[in-house]
Amino acid sequence: MGSSVEQNILVTGGAGFIGTHTVVQLLKDGFKVSIIDNFDNSVIEAVDRVRELVGPDLSKKLDFNLGDLRNKGDIEKLFSKQRFDAVIHFAGLKAVGESVENPRRYFDNNLVGTINLYETMAKYNCKMMVFSSSATVYGQPEKIPCMEDFELKAMNPYGRTKLFLEEIARDIQKAEPEWRIILLRYFNPVGAHESGSIGEDPKGIPNNLMPYIQQVAVGRLPELNVYGHDYPTEDGSAVRDYIHVMDLADGHIAALRKLFADPKIGCTAYNLGTGQGTSVLEMVAAFEKASGKKIPIKLCPRRSGDATAVYASTEKAEKELGWKAKYGVDEMCRDQWKWANNNPWGYQNKL
């Protein structure tokens, strides 16, 4: 496809799980990309794999910068040497449990980092942003599917940073109407690039279901803890909307194109999910099918603050962004397993 004039995109947190997959799609779509990442929850190997995936020609259009959004000088350095057409802002801490134990770290990283980014963008007159929000801004929704105009509420400090940052975006855009900001509320990103060469590789014990299942499947962890088996759902386990990371990556490109095409976008939120709810136990069964491995489970009490069922209404993104998730649970598990099987220790390549 390619853009007629090469547009230059800054991707914060571009070495992370969703970042790497989005960078691959951006490069393939003809964009130039600069990544800024501090490797808090990622590694340089992930960026090297992205380069291998896209090949030497497209790799020339990817520029990596080690930096931290909490240090304004790191952002300033980037903006002073090149012009960016837009920013995709992934960088942030994302573990609910850790945010409850260490809220200051979350406020410092997620809020201060983002405010520094806005300040620098404004200074250099780059006023287009795609922001990583989250379905956590719906709290425990009274009804499902979640629609973008629902009342928002956060259940924990992580969710609160996402909610605050949405409000900050709305306030900035209202005061300075030339800004164009799209807030993408992700549901539960899973899967991996179909090549099996990039995927999710969290540091420490995984906080999310799929990397946890994956580590059990490859023998890194003995069993999967299933939190809550007495929810009012068909099998008693919690229901979530899992979305393939490649669908998510394409959603970011659809959002970018919307920013460039629609001067009246203002500050608008879109759900990125499949619109389908899948229970934890259904996901385990699908992964067992894809991998041919048995996943031993341990039923544990519910975690406080976990909702029974959350899934997206996807109509708004379909109608306004022309985007719809293509992949189902079987493909998510197939690609997750390919990544896990090729890289049992993630990017560390331990034997």
Curated annotation (Swiss-Prot):
GO BP, sorted A to Z: capsule polysaccharide biosynthetic process; cell wall organization; galactose metabolic process; UDP-L-arabinose biosynthetic process
Binding site for substrate: 134
GO cellular component: cytosol; plasma membrane
pH dependence per the entry: Optimum pH is 7.0-9.0.
Catalyses which reaction(s): UDP-alpha-D-glucose = UDP-alpha-D-galactose; UDP-beta-L-arabinopyranose = UDP-alpha-D-xylose
EC top class named in words: isomerase
Cofactor section: NAD(+)
Keyword Disulfide bond annotated: no
GO MF: UDP-arabinose 4-epimerase activity; UDP-glucose 4-epimerase activity
Enzyme Commission number: 5.1.3.2, 5.1.3.5
Induction: Not induced by galactose. Down-regulated by ethylene.
Keyword line: Carbohydrate metabolism, Cell wall biogenesis/degradation, Cytoplasm, Galactose metabolism, Isomerase, NAD
Pathway: Carbohydrate metabolism; galactose metabolism; Nucleotide-sugar biosynthesis; UDP-L-arabinose biosynthesis; UDP-L-arabinose from UDP-alpha-D-xylose: step 1/1; Cell wall biogenesis; cell wall polysaccharide biosynthesis
Compartments, record wording: Cytoplasm
Tissue: Ubiquitously expressed. Highest expression in stems and roots.
Residues holding NAD(+): 8-39
Activation and inhibition: Strongly inhibited by UDP.
NCBIfam families xref list: galE (TIGR01179), PRK10675.1 (NF007956)
Family to which this protein belongs: Belongs to the NAD(P)-dependent epimerase/dehydratase family.
Assembly behavior: homodimer. Heterodimer.
Described purpose of this protein according to its UniProt entry: Catalyzes the interconversion between UDP-glucose and UDP-galactose and the interconversion between UDP-arabinose and UDP-xylose. Plays a role in D-galactose detoxification.
PANTHER family in UniProt: BIFUNCTIONAL UDP-GLUCOSE 4-EPIMERASE AND UDP-XYLOSE 4-EPIMERASE 1 (PTHR43725:SF15), UDP-GLUCOSE 4-EPIMERASE (PTHR43725)
Misc note: Does not seem to need NAD for activity.
Protein name, UniProt field: Bifunctional UDP-glucose 4-epimerase and UDP-xylose 4-epimerase 1
Organism name: Arabidopsis thaliana
Lineage per the UniProt record: Eukaryota, Viridiplantae, Streptophyta, Embryophyta, Tracheophyta
Gene symbol of the encoding locus: UGE1
